[in-house]
């Protein structure tokens, strides 16, 4: 089995959502934060890929201290906010069938290792 293009597209979508979720938890501590990422991607009705990656969440400093909602200045809005994500390492990648049996597969390692995505807010 060769992993289809939709696998790589879905992986990019999952990585973007992962990076965006950091905004829900507040500011980041620096402009680069290393994290572990994992997800399951359905390839077809009977095959699922399980992915574990080491990623770097990229952030940029924002000084949007003016609260437009309340019309006041608030230092709570200063800080590093996610701006992108890049893949550092492939820790685990496996494909299983509907019986949870491992399935041999081929994939483009460079296509995963070279992922660098920018968030568009």
Describe each model-derived feature in a short phrase.
Residues 3, 11, 15, 28, ...:
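Generic detector of leucine side chains in alpha-helical contexts
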Residues 28-109:
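Acidic, low-complexity, intrinsically disordered interaction modules
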């Amino acid at each position: 089995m060769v992993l289809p293009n939709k696998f790589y597209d879905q992986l990019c979508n999952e990585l973007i959502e992962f990076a965006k979720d950091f905004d829900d938890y507040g500011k980041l501590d620096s402009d680069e934060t290393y994290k572990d990422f994992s997800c399951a991607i359905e390839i077809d009705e009977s095959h699922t890929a399980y992915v574990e990656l080491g990623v770097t969440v990229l952030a940029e400093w924002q000084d949007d201290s003016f609260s437009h909602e309340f019309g006041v200045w608030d230092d709570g809005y200063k800080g590093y906010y996610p701006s992108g994500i890049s893949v550092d390492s492939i820790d685990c990648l496996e494909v299983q069938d509907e019986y949870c049996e491992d399935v041999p597969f081929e994939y483009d390692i460079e296509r995963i290792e070279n992922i660098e995505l920018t968030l568009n807010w």
